[in-house]
Swiss-Prot record:
GO biological process entries: DNA-templated transcription
Keyword Chloroplast applies: yes
Subcellular localization(s) per the UniProt record: Plastid, Chloroplast
InterPro entries: DNA-dir_RNA_pol_omega (IPR003716), RPB6/omega-like_sf (IPR036161)
EC numbers, comma separated: 2.7.7.6
Keywords per UniProt: Chloroplast, DNA-directed RNA polymerase, Nucleotidyltransferase, Plastid, Transcription, Transferase
Protein name per UniProt: Putative DNA-directed RNA polymerase subunit omega
One annotated GO molecular function: DNA binding
Organism, scientific name: Gracilaria tenuistipitata var. liui
Length: 80
């Protein structure tokens, strides 16, 4: 990938993360409560996933947001 393509890819990822964050906040009844849940999950992940290196470029807070949105919007993921 050349430098221009990398910038475009990173830009798209940022927009996806922002969209997912807004989606999570809109779904939630209480923004404060969901923010605390995300922070606690990210803190747990930071210490639990020290040995697991899936993608070191994704910070625990971003991973927590993306996982929580998927869990809420796609409950069939959890039931499987």
């Amino acid at each position: 990938m050349d430098n221009q393509n990398i910038k475009i890819y990173n830009h798209l990822k940022v927009h996806e993360i922002i969209y997912k964050t807004e989606e999570l906040l809109n779904i939630s009844d209480n923004r404060y409560k969901i923010t605390i849940q995300i922070a606690n999950r990210a803190k747990r992940k930071k210490y639990e996933d020290l040995d697991i290196i899936d993608d070191p470029t994704i910070k625990p807070i971003i991973r927590s947001i993306l996982e929580m949105v998927d869990e809420i919007t796609q409950p069939e993921i959890i039931s499987d």
